[in-house]
């Protein structure tokens, strides 16, 4: 079942022009947009049906207060990504929106950086850029979907905790990280502390300004076709 509705209202996009263009030593083209986003494009036909897009900014988990980290434990962050969707589209509606297309985008938060990873086929690159734009500017926080995910984790938690490999990893982390409070282990107490309001607070802070972000686009792309799409979607990031 597909949903025939546009992902976004393109008339609301302001866009911004390319302020500077230069060629790199590896055949890449570097565009600097007026909104401060740097775009590095490396056309390659190594995989003819693939385009990989990565938007990255400095910060990552270093920007998250220790008391907020339980909401970003790996399993909880994964359920947020899986269940909550984007804009007005839920995690179950979005795949129907994308029926017949090969495109996706997902936010990431690593230790020192955060951003959005996206990918598509060459023909669906505009959809991937739309999803990246929405993930940045119009994230979706659905308390009901989030709680469903939390209950799913609670249901399997005893099995996870009984796994010897899981216990070994906990003990190893305690020794290796000297009981650092920023290194988390999944348990009942952590699940009680995790909440969607904290995820939303931190997420909106991290993704409020794209100035200084670097976007790499690698794959089977045509620069002249790509340029107006970059200006339209990446150029509309705040």
Label every model-predicted segment.
Residues 134-141, 233-238:
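A common structural junction motif
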Residues 1, 40, 47-82, 86-138, ...:
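M16 family metallopeptidases and their MPP-like homologs
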Residues 1-66, 211-238:
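Proteolytic maturation boundary segments
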Residues 206-208:
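Edge/loop elements at the starts and ends of beta-strands within beta-rich repeat scaffolds
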């Amino acid at each position: 079942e597909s949903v025939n509705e546009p992902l976004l209202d393109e008339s609301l996009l302001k866009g911004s022009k390319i302020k500077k263009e230069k060629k790199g030593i590896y055949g890449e083209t570097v565009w600097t947009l007026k909104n401060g986003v740097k775009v590095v494009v490396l056309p390659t036909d190594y995989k003819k049906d693939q385009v990989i897009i990565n938007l990255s900014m400095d910060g990552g988990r270093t920007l998250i207060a220790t008391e907020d980290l339980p909401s970003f434990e790996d399993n909880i962050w994964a359920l947020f990504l899986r269940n909550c969707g984007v804009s007005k589209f839920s995690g179950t509606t979005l795949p129907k929106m994308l029926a017949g297309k090969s495109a996706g985008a997902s936010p990431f938060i690593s230790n020192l950086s955060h951003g959005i990873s996206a990918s598509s086929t060459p023909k669906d690159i505009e959809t991937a850029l739309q999803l990246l734009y929405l993930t940045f500017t119009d994230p979706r926080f659905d308390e009901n979907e989030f709680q469903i995910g939390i209950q799913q984790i609670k249901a399997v938690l005893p099995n996870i905790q009984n796994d010897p490999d899981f216990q070994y990893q906990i003990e190893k982390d305690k020794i290796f990280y000297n009981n650092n409070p920023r290194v988390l282990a999944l348990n009942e107490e952590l699940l009680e502390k995790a909440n969607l309001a904290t995820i939303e607070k931190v997420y909106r802070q991290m993704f409020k300004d794209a100035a200084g972000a670097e976007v790499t686009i690698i794959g089977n792309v045509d620069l002249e076709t790509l340029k107006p799409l970059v200006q339209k979607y990446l150029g509309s990031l705040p």
